[in-house]
């Protein structure tokens, strides 16, 4: 795991910032979000990274991130919505950052595009709970999560999403350990989704209607 981290930092250099998702979904499960002790659901590498010296974690009790690098403070701002103003996705897009996936098909960056576009098949749901910060201080926190409407078929259409974003200009794909590493320019990723949503607001969900 350390070898992988060393490779990342070698590539991004002193001016780069490494960000990894450390999602816990704590408030969705009525659990306390402890920034130091709440384990991530995102795999061994992400859990290993968040425990490294100098790594900081965001305050989001649902979709947190572990961050280290030259511009880390830009990504550590508090936010009232998981995919809203000042969230990691917004800063990554504005900073023209890169978005990389190791295998898997789900892309949470898509939800940022959906919230900013205000898609009809999601709505803001408020979650509240206890957050314990890095100084072991507890306080109440409330955050909005732009969740799916369950009365319609709003499951993500992964085939459509992947086909769309894999057509961005700077998309790169490499085989690795029996799966794929995909790299996107975050701004291009968001803009192509907005372009498609302008044409058809159902294009990113299973309830896909070609004549919507």
Where are these regions (language model features)?
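N-terminal and secondary-structure boundary signal
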Residues: 1-212
